[in-house]
Design a protein with these regions (language model features):
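Conserved, mostly hydrophobic/aromatic
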Residues: 53, 110, 131, 189, ...
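Glycine-rich active-site/cofactor-binding loop and its immediate structural neighborhood
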Residues: 104-143
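Alpha/beta enzyme core
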Residues: 174-321, 337-339, 344
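Short beta-alpha connecting loops at secondary-structure transitions
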Residues: 290, 294, 348-360
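C-terminal helical cap(s) of enzyme catalytic domains, especially alpha/beta-barrels
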Residues: 302-308, 353-371
Length: 398
């Protein structure tokens, strides 16, 4: 056997090794036969792992460097405990909350994940149909495999739009105007990948694949653009296709804000200092995010960053969070700390990979049910009644 083939076989063994499960997911007692069989959202993970080719699994499931931040996104939830109050009328739970003047049916949204056709043939449209059915807000990636206009039509309302900024302002304006023309109410500029990233574990998984990926990435950032000429085409049609300007500074926030009537949210905030700067520069909100442990190896879970950020900007400034959320009780902890909404990524992609729209719907059902139960168990039957009095960090009040 040649050295190349020996390395290839070793990587195949590595991909299947249960030793890696702790970093990239969690064990389940068995592979479920249908979406309705899922008891918690991670029941979809083993089936998704079997369904996806190595490169696609590696793209979704792994982190950067040694996957420390990826693991901490989960482990950090153990730092927080709940304070349950008793003898409150908990016969019903009301999960509704108001965000930017719009009432959400629940404080859980579908985070942006690119190129969803690599996970299921219907891609973002299956996710949109599920989000519509379960009354969840969807955030669409710049790297979408389906144009924003088509997603908006399927969803029944325009999604939030996650922006990977093109390198020039002319191209940025073309893309932003197209998204605005599609009716998107919120622009979430991702700022945590401007220096690139070291996805070495995912790279090892790609070595297991010999396929040409153009068939499933054809609408990704290779080809957004102006509404008149490019509606319905790939989001970066007519543009150079290069994104994430490394020279971007805080001055970009004001310029981007003046370019659109959409609300501007900065995604990828990891410190209180930057959250405060975002507010001062005119952003309408921030998303505490480390790209699911796939950007910078900070070693900090987003739930641990959240108190610092909210303390820096105050409770009136909208702060959202994503990264590692797998339980309704996880969502509850973020709401208690002060988050306005919580984004989920990998769980719904595992559902999508396993059962398409039905899988995404079931993930949203489970998280909603778990959050509702936690709210009632803790004596806080409305979102507004969830406060820092409901949570401890390492046994102490926040």
């Amino acid at each position: 056997m040649s050295n190349f083939h020996a390395r290839r076989e070793f990587l195949r063994f590595l991909a299947a090794s249960p030793l890696l499960t702790q970093a990239w997911g969690q064990d389940a007692p068995g592979v479920i036969a249908s979406a309705k069989d899922a008891i918690n959202v991670m029941d979809f993970e083993p089936l998704a792992r079997k369904a996806l080719p190595p490169a696609h699994w590696g793209y979704m499931a792994t982190g950067v460097d040694d996957d420390v931040t990826l693991r901490m996104n989960r482990q950090a939830f153990e730092h927080y405990q709940l304070r349950a109050r008793r003898l409150v009328d908990v016969s019903k739970a009301d999960l509704r909350t108001e965000v930017f003047g719009t009432t959400w049916d629940m404080p859980i949204y579908v985070s942006a994940v690119g190129s969803q056709k690599v996970f299921h043939r219907d891609g973002e449209l299956a996710t949109a149909r599920a989000a519509k059915a379960k009354k969840a807000v969807q955030m669409l990636s710049t790297a979408t495999s389906v144009p924003v206009e088509e997603v908006a039509k399927t969803l029944g309302t325009p999604p939030w739009y996650q922006l990977y900024m093109p390198l020039t302002w002319d191209e940025t304006e073309k893309l932003v105007k197209r998204v605005e023309a599609a009716g998107c109410p919120v622009l979430a500029w991702t700022i945590d990948l401007l220096a690139g990233r070291n996805t070495e574990t995912a790279t090892r998984f790609t070595r297991l694949d010999n396929r040409d990926c153009l068939s499933c990435h054809m609408h990704s950032p290779k080809a957004g653009a102006n509404p008149a000429d490019n509606a319905g085409k790939p989001m970066l049609a007519g543009l150079a296709g290069t994104i994430n300007p490394p020279q971007a500074t805080w001055a970009y926030v004001d310029r981007l804000k003046k370019m659109t009537k959409m609300k501007l949210v900065l995604k990828g905030i990891d410190t209180g200092e930057d959250a405060k700067l975002a507010r001062e520069q005119g952003a309408d909100g921030v998303i505490v995010s480390n790209h699911g442990g796939r950007a910078t190896e900070t070693g900090r879970g987003t739930i641990d960053v959240l108190p610092e950020v909210i303390d820096a900007v105050g409770p009136q400034f909208p702060v959202f969070v994503d990264g590692g959320f797998r339980r309704g009780s996880d969502v509850y902890k973020a709401l208690a700390i002060g988050a306005k909404g919580v984004g989920i990524g990998r769980p719904y992609i595992y559902g999508l990979s396993s059962f398409g729209q039905e899988g995404v719907e079931r993930v949203l059902e489970i998280l909603r049910a778990e959050l509702s139960l936690t709210m009632r168990q803790c004596g806080t039957p409305t979102v507004a009644s969830i406060t820092r009095a409901s949570v401890l960090k390492n046994g102490a009040r926040l």
